[in-house]
């Protein structure tokens, strides 16, 4: 009986600690925490796709090289770090947050607009794959947008990198991914109905080997869409936290000095 009472006291103590921890969380943290189960589901879809790719093709590249899957896993990573360790160096100067927001925005727009126009989006009639696609391309991105808006509205006293530095850091991932995107058709092939075919990530729209128009698409996305979309998100953050815009766009010291001459 004594052991039972000790166990009950331990449970009560743990419950009190959990309640205390929950109360000290900010509203944005609570919002991201509430979405972690959703991001776990989308990451499970990604993991299932990797296993399926391994069993079907004997490799996992057909799954892990998808921008959608990479950015959805990024949402889970960010939500976990922000909720449980908001002072982490990974979250310094809002760089991870703004970048993740811009990346998942492209996942949302790229799939539901660009790939839909190209006739690639939502083609599967398999209920599981269709459900997975909706979660990855619609539900999870919208959830992150909601949580992000709440975070920006409620966290006014934040440090943000100067725009050009922030943009440079943001562009590292798209540029690396873009380089992979345009080169993979030249180096990887697979058999389709017994015939060798060019491997592309998103069909003809990214087939830089056989479709010259694909180069224009990739160039436009990398050097026009990504910088402009990041600029829009960056300005939105500044506006919502009522931070002066002009100082954030000052050129680096060396460029300013050269400009004055």
Swiss-Prot record:
<keyword id="KW-0812">Transmembrane</keyword>
<feature type="transmembrane region" description="Helical">
    <location>
        <begin position="71"/>
        <end position="91"/>
    </location>
</feature>
<dbReference type="InterPro" id="IPR011631">
    <property type="entry name" value="DUF1600"/>
</dbReference>
<dbReference type="GO" id="GO:0005886">
    <property type="term" value="C:plasma membrane"/>
</dbReference>
<feature type="transmembrane region" description="Helical">
    <location>
        <begin position="167"/>
        <end position="187"/>
    </location>
</feature>
<protein>
    <recommendedName>
        <fullName>Uncharacterized protein MG452</fullName>
    </recommendedName>
</protein>
<feature type="transmembrane region" description="Helical">
    <location>
        <begin position="101"/>
        <end position="121"/>
    </location>
</feature>
<feature type="transmembrane region" description="Helical">
    <location>
        <begin position="31"/>
        <end position="51"/>
    </location>
</feature>
<keyword id="KW-0472">Membrane</keyword>
<feature type="transmembrane region" description="Helical">
    <location>
        <begin position="130"/>
        <end position="150"/>
    </location>
</feature>
<feature type="transmembrane region" description="Helical">
    <location>
        <begin position="213"/>
        <end position="233"/>
    </location>
</feature>
<keyword id="KW-1003">Cell membrane</keyword>
<keyword id="KW-1133">Transmembrane helix</keyword>
<dbReference type="Pfam" id="PF07667">
    <property type="entry name" value="DUF1600"/>
</dbReference>
């Amino acid at each position: 009986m004594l052991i039972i009472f000790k166990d009950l006291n331990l449970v009560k103590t743990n419950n009190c600690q959990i309640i205390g921890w929950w109360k000290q969380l900010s509203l944005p943290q609570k919002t991201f925490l509430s979405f972690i189960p959703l991001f776990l589901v989308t990451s499970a879809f990604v993991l299932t796709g990797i296993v399926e790719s391994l069993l079907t093709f004997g490799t996992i590249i057909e799954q892990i090289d998808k921008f959608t899957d990479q950015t959805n896993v990024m949402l889970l990573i960010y939500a976990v770090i922000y909720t449980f360790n908001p002072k982490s160096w990974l979250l310094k100067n809002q760089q991870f947050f703004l970048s993740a927001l811009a990346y998942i925005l492209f996942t949302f727009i790229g799939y539901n607009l660009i790939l839909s126009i190209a006739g690639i989006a939502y083609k599967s009639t398999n209920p599981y794959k269709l459900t997975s696609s909706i979660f990855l391309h619609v539900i999870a991105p919208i959830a992150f947008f909601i949580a992000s808006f709440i975070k920006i509205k409620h966290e006014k006293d934040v440090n943000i990198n100067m725009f050009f530095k922030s943009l440079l850091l943001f562009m590292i991932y798209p540029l690396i991914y873009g380089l992979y995107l345009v080169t993979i058709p030249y180096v990887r092939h697979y058999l389709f109905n017994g015939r060798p075919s060019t491997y592309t990530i998103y069909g003809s729209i990214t087939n830089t080997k056989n479709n010259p128009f694909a180069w224009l698409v990739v160039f436009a996305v990398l050097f026009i869409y990504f910088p402009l979309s990041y600029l829009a998100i960056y300005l939105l953050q500044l506006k919502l936290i009522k931070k002066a815009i002009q100082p954030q766009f000052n050129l680096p010291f060396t460029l300013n000095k050269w400009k004055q001459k």
